[in-house]
Amino acid sequence: MAAKRNAVTTEAPESSAPGEGTALALDSRLSKRVESVIPKKRHEALKWFGWGYNDSQFYGKDGIICFRGEKYPLGGCELPSFTKWVEKKFDLRVDTTKQYPQLPRTYPRPVENAPFLHELKGTTQVDYSAEGIDRLVRCHGQTLNDIYSLWHHKFRRIPDLVVWPRCHDEVVQLVRLANKHNVMLVPFGGGTSVSGAITCPQNESRMICALDTSQMNRLLWLNRENLTVCFESGIVGQDLERVLRSEGLTVGHEPDSYEFSTLGGWVATRASGMKKNVYGNIEDLVVRVRMVTPSGTLERECSAPRVSCGPDFNHVILGSEGTLGVITEVVLKVRPLPSLRRYGSLAFPNFEQGVLFMREVARRRCQPASVRLMDNEQFMFGQALKPEKSWWASVVDAMKQRYVTSWKGIDLNQICAATLLFEGDLKDVQRQEALIYEIAEKFQGFPAGGQNGERGYILTFVIAYIRDFGLHQGIVAESFETSVPWDRCSLLCRSVKQRVVSECSKRSINYYTISCRVTQTYDAGACIYFYFGFRSTDVADPVELFEAIEHSARDEILSCGGSLSHHHGVGKIRSHWYRNAVTETGSSLYSAAKRHLDPKNIFALGNLLPLEEAQASPPPPTSSTPPKAKL
C-alpha cells in the first residue's frame, strides 16, 4: 500500500470530559489543542536512531568529548575531564571518524487488512500514514536492544500503519474497527519506554496499527476550586507543565523522561517523578482515568477524592502497559506553583552513612521535594561531567578538595554525595534546609553547595544522551531500577554490584562500570537505580551479553528482596519474572481481566505476561464451572 494520509482536517469532536460541565472550565481556549514541542512528524525534531532532540548530542572533536545543542546548559561545552574518565575506565580513545547510522533504504513490507482500511477511510476522519519513516520511528522504545536494532536495521516487524486520533471518540472508532477486523493495536505515546513495551511482537501475522496519541493533547477543563484538571492522554510532560505554569499551577510530576513522555504513558506504567515527596507518584495524582477497550470504555463515574465502592478500577488501568486498551483522558490533582525553588547538596564519607541519612529523613518524614544519594562511582562520574574550568576555578576546586581530604579526613575513593531540591515559600524552605542539614551532620555529612545540587538535576536530562554516544564509541550501557525495604537497602546495593563484577569476570570483561544511587525514599523503603556499561569493541553480540548480565543482576535483586520494578514497568524484558512477582493467583486475575476486556487480544503486546501466556485461552467450562463474573 502506498503511503497515504487522510485529507480531512476538520476540527475534532468535543470530548465528553468525564463528570465535569463546561461551567467549570477556566475559559473556552482550554479545550483547544496544545502546540507541542514535538511535531506530528516526530523525526523532524527527534532522533530516529536514539534519544532526544536532533540538535542535541555528545560528540568527539580533536580527541575531546563535547556536547552540542542549545536546549541544555551543557550545550557548546568541551568536557576534558569526562574524556579522561572514559579513556581510563574503558581503555579506549574517542573516535571522531565514526559515522552515526543512516536511515534504511527500504522498510518491511506492510501487512494490509483491506476491510479495515476501507472502513477507516470511508467512515472516519482519522489521519493515517503508511510511510516507512512514520512506521519506523513508532516501532520501538528506548531500550538498549531497541536502539542497537535500529542502528543495525534488525527490525523485521514494524507497524504497518500509523493512525492519529484527535479525541476519545475517534479512539472508540479505531478500537471498534480493529476489534471488528482483527487488527492489532499498539498505543504509542512518547516512545520513551525502557521495558520493550511498545516494540512490535516480531512474529505477529496480523496487521499492526500504531495508535499515536500525540494529537490528543488538549487541556479539556480546569477546576480551580477543586484544584483538578483534565488533560487528554497524549500531552507531553513539558507541554503539560508549560500550560499549567501559565495559569500559576503545576502537577509536579517530573520523571527523567519528562521532556518526551506522555501523560497516558505515565498512567500505563505507574510512573514516578523526582518530586514525588511533595506531589506524589502518578497513582497519587490521578483522580480519574478513561480507557477505551474492545469491550467498552472503562472509567469511574465519580470525581470524588476517595470512594469506598469495591475494587478501584483506576488501578486496573494504572500499570496496564497498553495491554487492555487505550488511555484517552486523565483527571489530575494540581497545586499552586511554589514561590521558591532552592538546590543543595551534601557529602558523606561513604555510601553506608549516606543510606543511614536517607533512612532517617524518611523515618522523620521530612523529605524535601527531591533527595538523591549517589555512590562513589556515580559521584566521580558526575564530577567528570563538569565543563572545562578557568584557572581560578581550578584553584578553588583544588582548595575544596584539600579541605575534604585533609581537614575532613575523607577518602575520595569512598566519598558519596546527595543532591537536594527544596520547594515552597521562604519559611518552608528555610525550615526544610535546617532540618536536613541537622540530620546530615549526625551521619558525618556536610553541605557541598547549591551549585553542585543544581548541576546534578540539570544533568538528569543530559545523561540519557550518553548511552547513544557510548554505543557509537563501542560501549554498551543502560540503567535498571528496583525498590527495596530499608533493612535490605545497603545489602542489595552491595550484592548487585558484586554480582555484576562477578559476571563480568566470568565473561572476561575487563573494562566496565557499575554504580548505583538511591533516588526515592518511602516510609518502608527506597528506590535504587543501577548504571552498568562495558567496552564492547571486541564482543560479537554486545547486547545479548549485556542482557545476560542484566538478567543475572535482576535475579540478584529479587533474591535480596527487591521488586521487579519501581517505575519502569515490566514490559517484555521483565515478563519472565512477572508470574512469580504477583503469584499464580495474581497472574490468573490479570489474565481474566485481559480476556474480558480484550477477548480477541487486539492489544497483543506481550507485556506483563509473555505473549504465549497472554494469548492462552481459558479452560473450557464444565457443568460445575460458574459463569465468569463481569468486571
From Swiss-Prot:
The keyword Transferase applies. Residues 1-22 are annotated as: Disordered. Residues 566-568 are annotated as: Important for enzyme activity. FAD binds at residues 187-193, 256-262, 269-272, 321-327. GO terms for biological process: ether lipid biosynthetic process; lipid biosynthetic process. Keywords: FAD, Flavoprotein, Lipid biosynthesis, Lipid metabolism, Peroxisome, Transferase. The active site is at Y529. GO terms for cellular component: peroxisome. Residues 155-337 form the FAD-binding PCMH-type domain. One of its GO terms (molecular function) is alkylglycerone-phosphate synthase activity. The record marks R372 as: Important for enzyme activity. Its cofactor is FAD. The keyword Ion transport does not apply. Its EC number is 2.5.1.26. SUPFAM superfamilies: FAD-binding/transporter-associated domain-like, FAD-linked oxidases, C-terminal domain. Pathway: Glycerolipid metabolism; ether lipid biosynthesis. It is found in: Peroxisome. A motif (Microbody targeting signal) lies at residues 629-631. It is an enzyme of class 2 (transferase). Catalyzes the exchange of an acyl for a long-chain alkyl group and the formation of the ether bond in the biosynthesis of ether phospholipids. PANTHER family: ALKYLDIHYDROXYACETONEPHOSPHATE SYNTHASE, PEROXISOMAL. Belongs to the FAD-binding oxidoreductase/transferase type 4 family. Homodimer. This is Alkylglycerone-phosphate synthase. It comes from Drosophila melanogaster (Fruit fly).
